[in-house]
Amino acid sequence: MSLLSDLKILLTPIGIPIEAGVFSDKAPDQYLVFVPLVDTFNLEADNKPGVDVQEVRLSLYSKGSYTAAKNAIVRALLSSDITITARQYIGFDAESGYHHYNIDVAQYYEMEEN
C-alpha cells in the first residue's frame, strides 16, 4: 500500500500529467508533481506500529487558471477519504509563467500482520 500509487490511480482520470519527485520531460502547460513528505508510525502501547501514516505534497503547476484543476483534485481526494492537511497558493513564477499551488495529503494504512 502506497499513497503515491493510490494518488496516481485516483488522479490520472483528471487528465493532468503526473510525475513523482520532479517532472522529467518538457513540462506541459499544466502538470502535477507528487513529493513524498513523511512516513510515520503511530505510537502504540506495545511499541509495535499498527498504522503507517504516509504524507505527500501535490504540487500543481499551471500556465493558465489553476482553479478548475485544483477543484477537481480536491473533489477526487475528498471522495476517496484521503485527508487534506493543507492547501496553499505558492505564487506565480514570472520567468517560467507557471502558477504554483500545493495540496498536502495524508493517508493511514493498517499494518499487515506477518
Feature annotation, model-predicted:
Residues 1-55, 61-114:
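Long, contiguous binding/interaction regions
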